[in-house]
Amino acid sequence: MALLSVAPLASKSRLHKTLITSAHHLKPSPTTIPTLPVCTRRKTFTASITMCLTAPVSDDGVKRRIGNHHSNLWDHDFILSLSTPYEAPSYRERAARLISEVKEMFTEIEDGLSITPLNDLLSRLSMVDSIERLGVDRHFKMEIKSALDYVHRYWSEKGIGCGRESGVTDLNSTALGLRTLRLHGYPVSSSVLEQFKDEKGQFATSSIQTDPGEIRTIFNLFRASLVAFPNEKVMEDAQIFSTIYLKEYLEKIPLSSLSRQIEYVMEYGWHTNLPRLEARHYMDVFGDNEMPWMSYVNTEKLLELAKLEFNIFHSIQQRELKHISRWWKDSGFSQMNFVRHRHVEYYTLASCFAIDPEHSAFRVSFAKMCHLGTVLDDIYDTFGTMEELQLFTAAVKRWDPSATDSLPEYMKRVYTVLYETVNEMAQVAKKSQGRDTINYARHAWEAYLDSYMKEAEWISTGCLPTFEEYYENGKISFGYRICMLQPILSMDIPFPHHILQEIDYPSRFSSLAAGILRLKGDTRCYQADSARGEEASCISCYMKENPGLTEEDVVNHIHGMVDDLIKELNWELLKPDCNVPISSKKHAFDICRAFHHGYKYRDGYSVATNEIKDLVMITVLEPVPL
């Protein structure tokens, strides 16, 4: 019987290798394939990877298609054994003192005690930028708003200089200001970048790429270009120019703190970046002498705070992860060898962008919803028969515990866990929203299963739909809505109906996010899906309608579509004067970023043995050295 091959770790930048600091041996299961070596900075460890060797004929005598997904990588007993010393009150007390001291740094800047009118704008922007990249900005919301209000006060159609009395604008301050102000919802136009082009329409630079100031300027230009809106040609020009410039720079110079920052941002961009991963990386380079603006900031205290916050959050992650693992174990899913077990990976994604300790319900709900969606994906795509799928879909629409009577045994357990978990999350949402939200959730799950039924019919009949038909259905079957809806309703952010309908399906926001994920996911999954008998994908449907195009042509076209959709989603999130605040949309937006992260190199949710496993190690299991 053929096994699903596990690809070796992709050849990537120095950055990715330096992020992997160590790993834990995983408890091997009885059936294993040759072990997968993973490189780390200090050593090489070996993890046993177990594959699901499901027989074509199941125990009930029914012939079924199989997925051959590798099994759970994270032993339940190993998860329960996790511990950390950072639960001690002394660490929280120290963090509280450091927060007060950092606030005093902001006060000194506001009072002009440590800066001058010649650098007061760039100083504020740099302070805000570093605090956000270190992952501690939640403690300084008022200070950040005050700093950005000040910068915006001096913003002009030509941008800004280093200070309010600089006399001339400069590209570094303007690019950093454009990015930071835009991300916080200020109405700033990218047209400010036009004045920094020469007579040939090119951004002006020196001929030798050795000046750290110029390199940092182009770096900030690249970062600004990542938050482009539709039809902003100057942002496209900025990204093309800065990408070429920075790649040439990285090829010429030795490893440094600045080059490591550039590598990280060029590797992860903004739409596949995760705040906790970025914070872990930035801690290793923060405070180096390549950051001259730091002269008025106590970088040691700021860095200590970031490290303490990172490690204190570990205790929260471990507590929540143990809960998730118990839920997975008690659900009986651990006995189902025909489905993917990615509960740990999904929780990790949530904890890498929802990093406020108070958002525990969001993280837990996200992990559970994602895992349930994945279990149903594997049932509808491969394991279930058409008759079973019709019965299960009808049972979910009844939404009654007695609806399991007509289901096969394996489906009874899945239905019960789905019913209980969705109702449980609805009760959590009722406390935070002050109203019953179960109907929102039920409608989302019904639409999800209806979209799967359509795909199952395509598989059973050998039908290859039109691209538009597949794409519209695929935006629902990806599962973005079911993974987003109940988690955001569990938060302490109010979502009245008029705001929720601007975020939930079929809103423009939801359609764009789901479209990005369906297109990107298909570029990573279509070959493996086709091998399992799932012929319909964005690639195959588009090729059918455009027979003159090669597979490579179509994949490149799909990537271009994703780039365009990302710009549109940027606008939906950040457009000024919107009746839906950014804070209400941010977690729904970050869910899209998190899923996108998993598709950066491959289908990280089917083959979770490489980058996604590294992410668990770096952000959940290993504390940062103090």
Curated annotation (Swiss-Prot):
Give residues annotated as binding Mg(2+) 1.
Answer: D377, D381
Could you name the domain of life of the organism this protein comes from? Eukaryota
Q: Which reaction does it catalyse?
A: (2E)-geranyl diphosphate + H2O = (S)-alpha-terpineol + diphosphate; (2E)-geranyl diphosphate + H2O = (R)-alpha-terpineol + diphosphate; (2E)-geranyl diphosphate + H2O = (2E)-geraniol + diphosphate; (2E)-geranyl diphosphate = terpinolene + diphosphate
Tell me which cofactor or cofactors this protein depends on.
Mg(2+); Mn(2+)
Q: Which Pfam families match?
A: Terpene_synth, Terpene_synth_C
For this UniProt entry, what's an example GO CC term? chloroplast
Matching InterPro entries? Isoprenoid_synthase_dom_sf (IPR008949), Terpene_cyclase-like_1_C (IPR034741), Terpene_cyclase_plant_C1 (IPR044814), Terpene_synth_N (IPR001906), Terpene_synth_N_sf (IPR036965), Terpene_synthase-like (IPR050148), Terpene_synthase_metal-bd (IPR005630), Terpenoid_cyclase/PrenylTrfase (IPR008930)
Binding positions for Mg(2+) 3 per the UniProt entry? D529
Record: residues binding Mg(2+) 2: D377, D381
GO terms in the biological process aspect are: diterpenoid biosynthetic process; geraniol biosynthetic process; green leaf volatile biosynthetic process; terpenoid biosynthetic process
Q: How is the cofactor bound?
A: Binds 3 Mg(2+) or Mn(2+) ions per subunit.
Range annotated as the organelle transit peptide: 1-38
Question: Its annotated pathway?
Answer: Terpene metabolism; oleoresin biosynthesis; Secondary metabolite biosynthesis; terpenoid biosynthesis
The record's keywords, sorted A to Z, are: Chloroplast, Hydrolase, Lyase, Magnesium, Metal-binding, Plastid, Transit peptide
* Compartment list: Plastid, Chloroplast
- One function term, GO molecular function aspect: terpene synthase activity
Instruction: Give start-end ranges for motif DDXXD motif.
Output: 377-381
Entry coiled-coil feature ranges = none
Give the EC number: 4.2.3.111, 4.2.3.112, 4.2.3.16, 3.1.7.11
The family this protein is said to belong to = Belongs to the terpene synthase family. Tpsd subfamily.
What this chain does, per the record? Monoterpene synthase (TPS) involved in the biosynthesis of monoterpene natural products included in conifer oleoresin secretions and volatile emissions; these compounds contribute to biotic and abiotic stress defense against herbivores and pathogens. Catalyzes the conversion of (2E)-geranyl diphosphate (GPP) to (-)-alpha-terpineol, (+)-alpha-terpineol and terpin-4-ol, and, to a lower extent, to geraniol, terpinolene and (-)-limonene.
Return the domain comment text from this UniProt entry.
The Asp-Asp-Xaa-Xaa-Asp/Glu (DDXXD/E) motif is important for the catalytic activity, presumably through binding to Mg(2+).
PANTHER family per the record?
A: (E,E)-GERANYLLINALOOL SYNTHASE, ENT-COPALYL DIPHOSPHATE SYNTHASE, CHLOROPLASTIC
Q: What name appears for this protein in its UniProt entry? A: Alpha terpineol synthase, chloroplastic
